[in-house]
From Swiss-Prot:
Protein's name according to its UniProt entry: ATP-dependent Clp protease ATP-binding subunit ClpX
UniProt subunit comment: Component of the ClpX-ClpP complex. Forms a hexameric ring that, in the presence of ATP, binds to fourteen ClpP subunits assembled into a disk-like structure with a central cavity, resembling the structure of eukaryotic proteasomes.
Residues holding ATP: P122, T123, G124, S125, G126, K127, T128, F129
Superkingdom of the organism of origin: Bacteria
UniProt keyword Amino-acid biosynthesis, yes or no: no
HAMAP family registered for this protein in UniProt: ClpX
Chain ranges of the ClpX-type ZB domain: 1-54
A Pfam family this chain is assigned to: zf-C4_ClpX
Keyword GTP-binding attributed: no
Task performed by this protein: ATP-dependent specificity component of the Clp protease. It directs the protease to specific substrates. Can perform chaperone functions in the absence of ClpP.
InterPro entries, A to Z: AAA+_ATPase, ATP-dep_Clp_protease_ClpX, ATPase_AAA_core, Clp_ATPase_C, Clp_protease_ATP-bd_su_ClpX, ClpX_bact, P-loop_NTPase, Znf_CppX_C4
SUPFAM superfamilies recorded: Glucocorticoid receptor-like (DNA-binding domain), P-loop containing nucleoside triphosphate hydrolases
Length: 421
């Protein structure tokens, strides 16, 4: 037992070497001494490590409404998708927290299975950004994977376990934190079977990849090579439990509207058809994309087992011109605000008039790139301006017009001794 002892000879701390005269207390043990300063330092180290461990715990999970409110600050439109995602994510992390707390209901009641998510929507509708925003709101590690780079074991390409490696890297190789992260797999529609007919040849990047993903989607102990690449027997692995990792898959699923149209059309053929048109394709209350069901994904080429591990399905609408204009100006990190900040650092103001914003949105629609293409259009418009402004101390304000966007005309400049008209 350690105690504060009086000794006849000089006593020094066994850790820092300070004498009894240099510190307030020295605690003695069998053949060892420690001073009060070293005790305080040890306590700080232990408290710091304990606090780092505590950060892995999910304490205050935001409610679905709080998640949507946060998403609304960054994501324009897609209200139905935001509500669906907020409920799904809330239930997922509520389940994770219950399992971590060893809740009695978890032990005695029904097992809470995880619900991964499918996002269906055109290019540039915000699928990736929604997934990224959810991870930021929940403060969990996040990784993006491209399904087209994956192949099944034995073929040239990436193993599916490399998806987990990206998540682990983004969690600073903290396995426990990575096991509560979110993985978004993009271009999932590109690994659909090419046809419903069974082929003699192997579908290396299609059904085989879907089969390879099944285990990690459902929950398994995966062996992840720390350096990535292909696995081999002599290699060391990091084991990751995917049970509590939320998987969100997304794809444009080009042509799925035709599948929905055929399905809805079949329902309106024959006796007993609804004459009021409630089941008709042209029902304005919902777009074709909003009426996608798992059966349509099956027809598209995803296998039943894969669809079954993605029980939550939500669709994103194609963004309209009005949506794109709002995306340019309203979110906290809106592109217009970003470029205004950049120009302000050079001592000038930047203004996009309404016609200019409309022209940018129309160009994005013409390119069929959705919100994803907005930055490149603005960058193309602003390149010469950002080249000249740092050298022009006389410029007070830059006004971007429709002609600046559409025809690469010179912007309107307000000089220091002028006033805007």
């Amino acid at each position: 037992m350690f105690e504060n002892t009086e000794t006849n000879g000089p006593v020094n701390c066994s850790f820092c070497g300070k004498s009894q005269d240099q510190v307030k207390k020295i605690v003695a043990g069998p053949g060892v001494y420690i001073c009060n300063e070293c005790i305080d330092l040890c306590k700080e180290i232990i408290d710091e490590e304990f606090s780092e461990e505590q950060t892995h715990e999910l304490t205050d999970i935001p409610t679905p409404k709080e998640i949507v409110d946060e998403l609304d600050q960054y994501v324009i439109g897609q209200n139905e998708a935001k509500r669906t995602l907020s409920v799904a994510v809330y239930n997922h992390y509520k389940r994770v927290k219950a399992m971590a707390d060893n809740d009695e209901e978890t032990e005695d009641g029904p097992e809470l299975q995880k619900s991964n998510i499918s996002l269906v929507g055109p290019t540039g509708s915000g699928k990736t950004f929604l997934a990224q925003s959810l991870a930021r709101i929940l403060d969990v590690p996040f990784a993006i994977a491209d399904a087209t780079t994956l192949t099944e074991a034995g073929y040239v390409g990436e193993d599916v376990e490399n998806i987990l490696l990206k998540l682990l890297q983004n969690a600073d190789y903290d396995v426990e934190r990575a096991e509560k992260g979110i993985i978004y797999i993009d271009e999932i529609d590109k690994i659909a079977k090419k046809s419903e007919n069974v082929s003699i040849t192997r579908d290396v990047s299609g059904e085989g990849v879907q089969q390879a993903l099944l285990k990690i989607l459902e929950g398994t102990i995966a062996n992840v090579p720390p350096q990535g690449g292909r696995k081999h027997p002599q290699q060391e692995f990091i084991q990751i439990d995917t049970t509590n990792i939320l998987f969100i898959v997304g794809g444009a699923f080009d042509g799925i509207e035709d599948i929905v149209k055929r399905r809805l059309g079949d329902k309106t053929i024959g006796f007993g058809t609804d004459t009021d048109g409630k089941n008709a394709v042209l029902d304005d209350s919902k777009s074709l994309m909003q009426q996608v069901v798992p059966e349509d994904l099956l027809q598209f080429g995803l296998i039943p087992e894969f669809i079954g591990r993605l029980p939550i399905l939500t669709a994103l609408e194609r963004l309209t011109e009005d949506d794109l204009v709002r995306i340019l100006t309203e979110p906290k990190n809106a592109l217009v605000k970003q470029y205004q900040r950049l120009i302000a650092l050079d001592g000038a103001e930047l203004d996009f008039n309404d016609d200019a914003l409309r022209a940018i949105a129309q160009e994005a629609l013409a390119r069929n790139t959705g919100a994803r293409g907005l930055r490149s259009i603005i960058e193309d418009t602003m390149r010469d301006i950002m080249y000249d402004i740092p050298s022009r101390e006389d410029v007070k304000k830059v006004i971007i017009t429709r002609e600046t966007v559409a025809d690469h005309a010179e912007p309107e400049l307000v000089l220091a001794d002028q006033k805007a008209s």
